[in-house]
UniProtKB/Swiss-Prot annotation:
It comes from Tetrahymena thermophila (strain SB210). Keywords: Cell projection, Coiled coil, Repeat, WD repeat. Residues 756-1016, 1045-1079, 1209-1285 form a coiled coil. This is Cilia- and flagella-associated protein 57 A. Associates with components of the nexin-dynein regulatory complex (N-DRC), a key regulator of ciliary/flagellar motility, and might act as an inner dynein arm (IDA) hub or linkage. WD repeats lie at residues 72-113, 309-348, 359-398, 411-450, 535-574, 700-739. Its main location: other. Belongs to the CFAP57 family.
Length: 1293
């Protein structure tokens, strides 16, 4: 038993590997959930947020990306949302208990700035000694780490609750007012609305969303009201549920929004796919059938927009608001525009223009409009991100300015099946099930080349030169040249179902798989020598070439690892190992550097997926040490060389991973080992080689990883998965990269292939442009010289003009200076005069003001004395009024207490009467129900017994009818056979008559010849005698045939009578069946009438119960109003007002209420009578329709009989005509034969008798037809009479 050396990579002793290794770029987009594209913060409109793989990507126009990774151990993002201020990003992840992650984007920017902050070296003036410089640097690094740790804790918050039994949430939304609360909708099985407080990180409210059992209800969205933070709405397939936060802290469901919907025009599909809250507070919801539902801000249904694309069944997947209305996205990459309208019934109208991407037929799942409304970003379900120029004016839209283009570059839309990296160039090639092959530049993060084919591509391989690739398709393999903008095939190999292609390290060979067979082709010739066709067992899944290209290893689905030699220095096939219940998916290896023997040891690593549950716990990677030795016994005679034999020199080692591994690889520097997982989510694990207990894991793919490759310098790693994403990782550790001494080799090659015609065209174009450039230079130099001359002339002219203008300005300045001095002197004189005038006016105004002040002071003293007198009088009046008010209040209180006692006594009496009436009513209602149930049960039993008897009779009649019909069919078949025989005999007779005619002609010719030639009379006479004998024999044969015809007619006669009798019996049976059906229909109508009466009684009972409830509410309202009056017993005015209200409400309104109740009773009686009349009318309509159908079936039967009779009459007419023609011909023949034969007369007599007989039969048939017509008329009259009687009965009813 082989010794197992267990090296576990998942035990408790593992540590995190510290390595500068991270994702550089993600080429892909996840479109499996909707509304997942967001704009970054308001200040930065160039960055877009979207999910790709198992991460969230923040990408900008400069082709750079930031990544927000998911929590390790979860299974991917399920929904996303962004706060209104675009600061907080929240998403949910799939795990055992639902997880919500809230991410602060502003602090993310601060974190990036802190990470990029570097230590600034001091200037020459501030130079310190080495120790102080070191302390300062250490202090800076410590502060930087503390700041980064603090921001990392603040930037991401994880929210979860144990009350959630779901694995994930399907919808999230932030509170629109302060963004401190978030609502989440969990999926099956519990469907909960959970309300979180972000500042405290706790669950505030949990409310179970009711889900009807048996319905296909599924909630997909939840959101806050934009202006009310306690109003939440949940929508989905089959439901719209609004909730309001109650005073008790729990959500209470409001009325459904469709309660008031009564019109049939408002019927719509219940599958709500998308929603949008518009700027005016209205809500728009789209359905799968194209209806756009408009809701008021209170979540009350208003209308279905008349311009909804419901006739096209345009499933509305997403809705995006904009300044003039909203956009609608759906199938076939079509975006519709809706703008605000003045019509109150339909406030939004559909614009005539729309955006449609004609080249794509995918479904739009996400829409994002930039804040300045200049660009529209579209996400489609084929995994593509598109952009289109946008304008809010729909009239400016046309095909030119609405052309779409990829936002960054086209991605794969389905599972990536092939991946390979180029050695000489920074290129990586991928192929996918979406029938495309793409070549990416991983240094510039650009798509270099792409081509779409008609078949799915399963594998791709890059030639080491970087000029060629090989792609495996469903039916063939194509060898292609890589041109600047195209991939052109130069050879095709007809190999089917190839799933793996690998170039040798030198590029002169490439190996392909063909189920269990591996074929090695010479690349430069495209030949496959017979000695390079290797056959194994099981499907080959992976190929690994040795470094010297002398052979390669293969792994298959049956767990076999086989080494195949390409040269002749050993056995062509060597089985290295076999692993039971293992599907091998990847092999890698290296030469053992510790080997000291002559032969080099090879270390091989094998990974795969367990094919049985027995080995499910043993998930590991196998390590094999392979050695070679020389086979001295099997020495080659031709060249005296020794063959090499390969064998496993050490026991296999197991490297436990804890998960299925799909791909493994070792770096070219032999210092790092990479694992790619098969499980979801797809993760890449890195560990040092030789193996240690340090591991680094990045869960980057949403689905399993299908391919993994490493660049030649080990600075980049590439993975591709089933989620259609290609992820580029960057290794910045120089220690773990390949060290290349020659610096010229480090630069990637930039050569590319170009067709010779294109090269010549470009060369000619370059020469032409050079000539044009020289000509343009000459022209420009000449133009510059001329311009310089013109410029100098203009400068001189301007200088002269400037001198003249300076002289004129100087003269003007001197003149203005003199005027200024004169004006200053005049203003000084005016100022002195105004000061004197102001002093005189001031003295006069002060004297007048002092006089007015003295008068006002004396007047104020008089008013104060009057005020004291008025206050004393007012106090005495207030005291008198208070005493009077208290006396009146006491009297009224006593009066109202007496009235209250009387009212209470009346109330008690009314309460007792009500209880007595309710008791009597319950007794009567129970008695009526018992009687009605007994009567219904009795009628049910009688009807069921009658129905059973009728069904039994019907079954017996059906059986008899089928038997008679079978007999009729057999007899009709026999009759047809006899008619066909008779037709054959008549054809024989006609052929004989034709031969007879020919003989008659010959006879006449012979008679003429007798008259003309006397020499041949004897010979002709003999011939005439022979011909006579022949005619006699033919006449006898004719007689025999006539006799047979008569016998056949005798046999047909009784059979036709039997057929007629059977027809009559079938008609009678059909009439009986119709009678049974009518009786059955009448019984059904009686049953339905009884059921309708029962429903009417139930409605009466419900109406009575409603009346009782109304009376109870009336009494309770009175009690409530009385208690309100009692509260104001101390306040006289309020008490008076309340009592007056009670009197007006309950005393004066009694008569009107009684009249209203009486009117309601009369209306109820009228409604009952109307319902009874409507049911009777419906029953009469059903009877009439049934009678019409019976009458129609009878008339069709009669028409069929008539057509049959007309057919028989026409047939007899044709026979009569034919017989008359035959009779005329026979008479002509008889007159010609009278002279030669006496027997012809007898034949003519027999023919005349036969004709007479046919005439008699024809007359009888006419009589039978006339009788049948009379019978049909009688049936029609009877049916008309029955219909008239039924109509009379219905009118009487």
């Amino acid at each position: 038993m082989a010794q197992q050396i267990v090296q576990s990579l998942q035990d408790e002793g593992t540590q995190s590997l510290k390595l500068d290794f991270s994702m550089k770029y993600v080429l892909g987009y996840r479109s499996d959930f909707k509304n997942n594209i967001f704009q970054y913060t308001m200040n930065d409109q160039n960055r877009i947020i979207y999910p790709a793989g198992n991460t969230i990507v923040i990408s900008n126009n400069e082709n750079k990306q930031q990544f927000i990774n998911c929590i390790p151990g979860t299974k991917g993002i399920t929904c996303m949302t962004l706060s209104p201020s675009k600061r907080l990003l929240a998403w949910s992840e799939d795990c055992d208990s639902g997880i919500i992650v809230v991410f602060d984007l502003i602090k993310l920017d601060k974190l990036e700035k802190a990470k990029n902050q570097n230590y600034q070296e001091p200037s020459d003036k501030d130079k310190l000694d080495k120790q102080a410089e070191k302390d300062r640097r250490d202090r800076f690094e410590k502060e930087k780490r503390e700041k980064i740790d603090k921001l990392q804790k603040e930037v991401k918050r994880i929210i979860t609750t144990l009350d959630c039994k779901s694995r994930h949430y399907v919808a999230l939304d932030f509170n629109k007012i302060n963004e401190k609360r978030i609502v989440a909708l969990s999926c099956a099985p519990d469907w909960q609305l959970i309300y979180f407080q972000l500042d405290k990180q706790k669950t505030v409210i949990i409310n179970q969303v009711p889900l009807k059992v048996g319905d296909n209800m599924r909630y997909t969205h939840c959101f806050f009201h934009p202006k009310e933070e306690d109003f939440i709405v949940a929508i989905g397939t089959g439901a719209i549920k609004p909730y309001k936060l109650g005073a008790d802290g729990q959500f209470k469901q409001k009325d459904p929004p469709f309660v008031k919907k009564e019109s049939k025009d408002q019927a719509h599909s219940p599958n709500y796919l998308s929603y949008c809250i518009l700027q005016d507070g209205y809500m728009v919801i789209g359905t799968d059938m194209g209806e756009i539902l408009l809701f008021q801000p209170s979540c009350e249904f208003k209308t279905i927009l008349a311009s909804s694309p419901k006739n096209e069944q345009f499933a509305i997947q997403c809705i995006q608001p904009y300044s003039k209305g909203f956009l609608v996205g759906g199938k076939e990459c079509t975006i519709l525009f809706y703008e605000k309208d003045v019509d109150l019934k339909n406030p939004y109208k559909l614009c005539s223009k729309k955006i449609q991407f004609r080249d794509m037929k995918a479904m739009i799942t996400s829409l994002l409009l930039t804040p300045n409304e200049e660009k529209l970003i579209v996400g489609v379900d084929s995994g593509q991100l598109l952009q289109v120029p946008f304008t809010s004016d729909s009239m400016q839209l046309n095909e030119e300015n609405s052309k779409c283009e990829p936002l960054f570059m086209p991605f794969h839309s389905d599972k990536i099946t092939g991946l390979d990296v180029c050695i000489r160039k920074s290129l990586v090639a991928t192929c996918s099930v979406d029938k495309t092959v793409r070549i990416w530049n991983y240094s510039d993060n650009q798509l270099e080349n792409s081509k779409e084919f008609e078949e799915e591509a399963y594998a791709v391989a890059f030639h080491p030169s970087g000029f060629h690739i090989i792609v495996a398709f469903t039916e063939k393999i194509r060898l292609m040249n890589i041109f600047e903008n195209d991939l052109i095939s130069f050879k095709e190999l007809s190999v089917k179902n190839c799933r793996e292609i690998q170039f040798s390290n030198g590029g002169h060979f490439f190996a392909i798989t063909n189920v269990s067979m591996v074929q090695v082709f010479q690349f430069y010739t495209g030949e496959n020598p017979s000695n390079l066709v290797f056959r194994g067992s099981g499907k080959v899944r992976t190929i690994f070439w040795e470094e010297d290209d002398q052979g390669f290893y293969t792994g298959s689905t049956d767990g076999l690892v086989i080494y195949w030699r390409v040269d002749d220095n050993g056995p062509q096939k060597t089985q290295i190992a076999q692993f039971n219940n293992l599907i091998i998916t990847s092999i890698t290896g290296l030469y053992n550097p510790d080997t000291t023997t002559q032969g080099l040891e090879r270390i091989l690593f094998v990974s795969g997926v367990s094919s049985s549950q027995e080995n499910e716990g043993e998930k590991c990677v196998y390590k094999l040490v392979i050695s070679c030795r020389q086979d001295k016994e099997g020495r080659e005679i031709t060249d005296n060389t020794l063959k090499k034999i390969y064998y496993v020199s050490q026991p296999e080692q197991k490297i436990f991973t804890g998960t299925n591994v799909s791909q493994i690889a070792i770096s070219h520097s032999k210092k790092l080992f990479f694992f790619a997982t098969e499980d979801r989510p797809g993760a890449i694990r890195i560990t040092k080689y030789p193996f240690t207990n340090e591991i680094m894991e990045i869960q980057s793919h949403f689905g399993p990883i299908t391919r993994m490759r490493i660049s030649f310098k080990d600075n980049y790693i590439f993975t591709a998965g089933e989620d259609g994403a290609l992820i580029i990782y960057e290794n910045k550790e120089k220690e773990y990269q390949v060290k290349i001494e020659n610096e010229s080799v480090e630069a990637a090659a930039e050569e590319f292939l170009i067709p010779r015609d294109q090269y010549n065209d470009q060369k000619r174009e370059i020469e032409k442009l050079k000539r044009q450039l020289n000509e343009e230079r000459m022209k420009q130099e000449q133009q510059i010289k001329e311009k310089m001359k013109d410029r100098d002339d203009k400068i001189n002219q301007l200088e002269n003009q400037q001198k003249d203008s300076d002289n004129r300005d100087l003269n003007k300045y001197q003149l203005l200076e003199r005027e200024k001095n004169e004006m200053i002197e005049s203003y000084e004189e005016k100022k002195r005069m105004m000061k004197l005038q102001h002093e005189n006016n001031k003295r006069t105004i002060e004297n007048e003001y002092k006089k007015k002040i003295a008068l006002e002071m004396s007047r104020n003293e008089e008013l104060a004395r009057e005020k004291e007198k008025e206050e004393k009088r007012f106090q005495s009046e207030i005291q008198q009024y208070q005493e009077e008010h208290l006396r009146q209040m006491e009297e009224k209180r006593r009066h109202y207490e007496e009235q209250l006692a009387i009212e209470k006594q009346l109330y008690n009496d009314l309460h007792l009467k009500r209880e007595e009436l309710a008791y009597k009513f319950d007794q009567k209602r129970n008695k009526l129900e018992m009687e009605a149930e007994e009567l219904i049960d009795q009628l049910k039993e009688e009807n069921e017994s009658k129905m059973q008897v009728l069904f039994k009779n019907l079954e017996k009649a059906e059986i008899k009818k089928m038997d008679r019909r079978n007999d009729y069919d057999t007899e009709a078949q026999k009759l047809e056979e006899q008619k066909s025989k008779l037709k054959g005999t008549m054809e024989d007779i006609t052929s004989i008559q034709e031969t007879n005619k020919m003989l008659q002609k010959e006879k006449e010719s012979h008679a003429k010849e007798i008259d003309e030639r006397e020499k041949t009379i004897r010979d002709k006479g003999r011939r005439i005698y022979e011909l006579k004998k022949k005619t006699q024999e033919l006449e006898k044969f004719k007689f025999v045939l006539d006799y047979k015809i008569k016998e056949l007619k005798r046999d047909i006669g009784p059979k036709e009578e039997e057929i007629a009798k059977m027809k009559e019996q079938i008609a009678n049976m059909n009439s009986e069946i119709l009678h049974f059906k009518r009786t059955n229909a009448n019984l059904k109508l009686i049953v339905t009438d009884l059921r309708l009466r029962q429903e009417g009684m139930k409605k009466e009972i419900e109406d009575q119960s409603k009346v009782i409830q109304q009376n109870n509410q009336y009494i309770k309202a009175f009690e409530q109003d009385m208690s309100d009056c009692h509260q104001h017993i101390a306040d006289y005015k309020k008490l008076k007002q309340k009592v007056l209200n009670l009197y007006n409400q309950y005393v004066q309104g009694d008569d009107s209420k009684k009249k209203r109740l009486e009117n309601n009773d009369q209306q109820k009686e009228i409604m009952k009578e109307r319902a009874h009349l409507e049911t009777s009318v419906n029953n009469l309509k059903i009877k009439h329709d049934k009678n019409q159908s019976v009458h129609k079936s009878d008339t069709t039967i009669i028409m069929k009989h008539n057509t049959f009779l007309i057919f028989e009459i026409n047939h007899l007419k044709r026979e009569k005509k034919k017989i008359l023609e035959d009779k005329a011909k026979m008479l002509m023949q008889a007159t010609q034969k009278k002279k030669q034969d006496g027997t012809s007369r007898v034949d003519i007599d027999s023919l005349e008798k036969e004709i007479q007989k046919n005439e008699d039969e024809k007359r009888k048939l006419k009589e039978d037809i006339e009788k049948l017509r009379q019978y049909n008329d009688q049936i029609k009259n009877q049916l008309r009479q029955q219909i008239q009687n039924q109509q009379d009965d219905d009118e009487d009813n």
